Each structure stands twice: as structure tokens, then as C-alpha cells.
Amino acid sequence: MRTPTLLILVAVCQPVSAGESVRNKHELNQWNPLQASYKIHSGSTAYSEPPTKADSAITVHFGGTAAKRLFDQIGPDVKEGCSDAKGDRERRNKGVHCTFTARLQHPGNSHYRCWIGIDLRTGGGSARVPC
């Protein structure tokens, strides 16, 4: 189903200048600001190559309040996640992959991080984030 995945990406990537509905406080069911990075690639995000006609995807990465909101919405935690560190959690749902890291390596990092991936050939969800 490509429509739900595309709607999630549009909602997450809506620019800050979307109108008067953007407020300082992050709320559900309204447009909120998002600081994010994206990559258009083939393969996984860790070992990516330039996109090809046969394999092209976009992955959007973000943390902070937006990642926590998304993490809270896509539960439950996966049984076997990438991290075995105490307190770490992971949730996945088709093209959405979110993590909670209990112990941060750097004080400026966010406990919550999410990746949203879309296969640009099919429009389907494709979170290509390896462990």
C-alpha cells in the first residue's frame, strides 16, 4: 500500500512555513516543525550506492520530539531488536523504523531516532536501516 506510506512522509516532512497551524508546542493532528536529513540511494543506508533504475529509495532520518511522537504511535517493541543494551527499544512498521537509546554516547544526541523509507519505484514502505 503506497498511499499510507506517502502520507506519513508528507506529514513528517511538511515545512515549517506550512501556515498558521504551526505552533511552538508539538501536538498531534497538526503540522509541526521537523529538523531532518534525507538520502536518495540504492541498497541500505549504511552501504548505499547512487540510485539506479532498478533500485531507488528515499530515507528520511530525524530525532527529538518528532521521533518520540512517531515511536509512541507505531508500537509495540520488536522482540529481537538491533541493540542488546539494557533499556534500548526498537519499533518497526513497514517503512518506519524507530529506536530508543537509553544511554546516549553524546549529550547532544536524542534518545529517540526514526527513519522513514520509501521505495521510489513502487511507492511502498522500505526502511533500509541495518543493525
Tell where the protein language model's regions lie, with residue ranges:
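Sec-dependent signal peptide recognition
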Residues: 1-8
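Residue-level signal for mature regions of secreted extracellular proteins and peptides
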Residues: 6, 75-76, 91, 107, ...
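N-terminal signal peptide c-region/cleavage motif recognized by signal peptidases
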Residues: 13-15
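Cleaved targeting-peptide boundary
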Residues: 17-28
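Mature extracytoplasmic domains of secretory-pathway proteins
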Residues: 35-98
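Disulfide-rich extracellular modules and peptides
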Residues: 84, 100, 116-118
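Short beta-strand elements that form the blades of beta-propeller/WD-repeat-like
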Residues: 97-106
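Short, exposed beta-strand-loop hairpins at the edges of beta-sheets
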Residues: 105-131
